[in-house]
């Protein structure tokens, strides 16, 4: 019996009482047998996540949101109407499946997006698995505004390159922002591009969105684009060693970028002018890398763009400025 014990009032317990105690006690210890509704499951899940050493940096900022997202999407329910379903009863199979997912989230530190094979960026759903970085980029916010005011006429944009496309999420958003453009997504990882192909198919863009395996511009020689966007690797060597366990489920190739986090950005900017049209520009995300960017490219005219994460996450550089800067560097 549990340490707390069962107590009978008055006389000592009969053999029937003892038998019932042994039948019931395991049920009290097993959450499977005590969670009846989505509300019950949600309360238990939040406690499990909140009391575990977890990191929430892959779309859900807290245990509350992580639990609601996991439960809703595992049950194929719309999370914007979560409250409507809180008192709905769960089937045994539903309960077992979600408790198993919570167990993997807590003990394996697997990000919820990988557990569900699903991630959301702005209001768009994307397929995701461990072959590609979980979609998260402030560039998505800028694409929602069609990169205004920098792209003055979205319908006039003819070509866009998403460098380091990964799952293809930004390339797909770019295709929506610039309907007349030929959008190309490139990545060094063929495995990541297989994920991008799934998303391209899901968004019915197989005829319009081009995917190219390339180490940055290597397989794009001779091609120029009106706009280049990139969310490249920018995590420093020291930061890589300190990353929470959740991030270690992601491809290191999509994160690691040398001592100052600028190894890939240096290569991108050094060649970008050769792949931009005359009035073209590049938009690059660098996390908290403002100081690293300014140290790596002193004197380069760049504009830091305002996003929800601050004014030090994403920058823009014009082709003419890049060409002049790197010409003088040599």
Feature roles, as predicted:
Residues 20-122:
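N-terminal auxiliary segments of SAM/dcSAM-dependent transferases
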Residues 52-57, 146-154, 204, 276:
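Alpha-helix termini
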Residues 85-92, 96-179, 189-195:
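SAM-dependent Rossmann-like transferase core, predominantly class I methyltransferases
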Residues 144, 180-182, 186-330:
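S-adenosylmethionine
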Residues 42, 67-68, 98, 167, ...:
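A general structural signal for well-ordered alpha-helical segments in protein cores
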Residues 11-13, 17:
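Acidic, Ala/Val/Gly-enriched low-complexity intrinsically disordered segments
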């Amino acid at each position: 019996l549990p340490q707390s014990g069962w107590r009978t009032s008055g006389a000592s317990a009969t053999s029937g009482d003892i038998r019932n105690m042994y039948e019931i006690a395991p049920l009290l210890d097993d959450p499977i047998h005590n969670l009846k509704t989505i509300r019950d499951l949600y309360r238990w899940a939040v406690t499990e996540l909140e009391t575990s050493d977890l990191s929430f940096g892959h779309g859900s900022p807290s245990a509350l949101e992580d639990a609601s997202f996991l439960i809703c999407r595992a049950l194929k329910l719309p999370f914007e109407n979560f409250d409507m379903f809180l008192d709905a009863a769960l089937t045994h199979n539903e309960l077992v499946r979600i408790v198993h997912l919570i167990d993997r989230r807590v003990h394996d530190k697997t990000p919820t997006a990988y557990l569900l094979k699903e991630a959301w960026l702005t209001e768009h759903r994307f397929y995701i698995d461990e072959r590609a970085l979980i979609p998260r980029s402030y560039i998505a916010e800028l694409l929602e505004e069609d990169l205004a005011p920098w792209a003055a006429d979205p319908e006039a944009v003819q070509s866009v390159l998403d460098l380091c496309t990964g799952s293809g999420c930004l390339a797909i958003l770019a295709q929506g922002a610039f309907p007349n453009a030929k959008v190309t997504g490139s990545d060094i990882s063929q495995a990541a591009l297989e994920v991008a192909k799934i998303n391209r198919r899901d968004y019915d863009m197989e005829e319009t969105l081009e995917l190219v395996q390339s180490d940055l511009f290597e397989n794009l020689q001779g091609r120029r684009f009106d706009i280049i966007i990139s969310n490249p690797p920018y995590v420093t060597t020291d930061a890589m060693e300190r990353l929470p366990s959740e991030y270690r489920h992601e491809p290191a190739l999509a994160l690691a970028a040398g001592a100052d986090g600028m190894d890939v950005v240096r290569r991108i900017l050094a060649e970008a002018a050769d792949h931009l049209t005359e009035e073209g520009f590049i938009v690059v995300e660098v996390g908290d890398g403002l100081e690293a960017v300014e140290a790596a490219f002193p004197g380069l005219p760049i504009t830091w763009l305002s996003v929800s994460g601050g004014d030090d996450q994403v920058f823009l550089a014009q082709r003419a400025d890049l060409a002049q800067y790197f010409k003088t560097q040599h």
